[in-house]
């Protein structure tokens, strides 16, 4: 009888031990998931319509982004190794004019991207404009994005889709150079320069994947020049 009781006790201890081992593994797996590294490369993707808070009309405006960081990939004079903010990808701007009943579009090539937690600025050089659009081919324009999260989950509240997202852009009076008594001119846009995301998204949304700006890669063997820009 004693032997049978001992065997049952040992079996119960073994089962409990296995349970604790499984629980420990689950906790460890959960901790590993929480410690997952951030994306190696930053990105901004998505398409959304938005409204201008300072101008109400029936026009339909939208931006589409497919931008990825490509650090140290765009050599510049004096900076042969490029910059940590270098990027690639595309942007598309669409503007339906209710007054003219026509949609104007333009496309651009991304050249710079910087991200923070749920926020980003990027710039692109316009490569294509639809007939009747402004003569801006070759011009750099800037955009900013606030990723408000999924409004059904971790976002800031209700609304349709990702309607807590916001965008900003570098034209329509937010990037001017006042010159005394003469009318101000629109200022040139530098890489990664854009105003804060001031325009609320009404449909669609964006996803910002944040990654820290990386250090320059090692200099090529035998080279005395740094691979990236020298800190000042």
Report the location of each language-model feature.
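Secretory targeting and sorting signals
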Residues: 1-32
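Predominantly extracellular/secreted and cell-surface proteins with exposed
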Residues: 59-142
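Extracellularly exposed regions in secreted/surface proteins, prominently low-complexity, repeat-rich
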Residues: 151-232
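C-terminal region of N-terminal signal peptides and the immediate post-cleavage residues
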Residues: 22-47, 53-55
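Short, flexible beta-strand-to-coil junctions
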Residues: 49-54, 96-97, 147-149
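Acidic, glycine-rich flexible loop segments
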Residues: 114-177
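Serine/proline-rich low-complexity intrinsically disordered segments, especially terminal tails, linkers
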Residues: 45-49, 64, 221, 225
């Amino acid at each position: 009888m004693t032997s049978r009781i001992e065997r049952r006790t040992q079996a119960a201890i073994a089962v409990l031990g296995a349970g604790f081992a499984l629980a420990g593994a689950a906790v460890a797996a959960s901790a590993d998931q929480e410690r997952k590294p951030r994306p190696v490369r930053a990105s901004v993707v998505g398409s959304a319509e938005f409204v201008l808070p300072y101008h109400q009309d029936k026009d339909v405006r939208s931006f589409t982004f497919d931008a990825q960081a490509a650090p140290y990939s765009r050599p510049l004079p004096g900076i042969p190794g490029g910059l940590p903010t270098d990027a690639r990808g595309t942007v598309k701007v669409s503007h339906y004019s209710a007054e003219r009943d026509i949609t104007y579009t333009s496309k651009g090539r991304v050249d710079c991207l910087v991200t923070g937690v749920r926020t980003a600025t990027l710039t692109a050089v316009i490569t294509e404009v639809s007939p009747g659009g402004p003569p801006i081919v070759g011009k750099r324009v800037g955009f900013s994005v606030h990723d408000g999260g999924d409004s059904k989950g971790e976002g800031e509240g209700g609304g349709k889709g990702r309607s807590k997202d916001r965008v900003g852009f570098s034209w329509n009076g937010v990037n001017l150079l006042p010159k005394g008594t003469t009318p101000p001119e629109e200022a040139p846009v530098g890489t990664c320069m854009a105003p804060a995301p001031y325009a609320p998204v009404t449909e669609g949304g964006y996803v910002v994947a944040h990654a820290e700006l990386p250090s320059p890669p090692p200099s090529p063997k035998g080279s005395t020049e740094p691979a990236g820009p020298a800190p000042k």
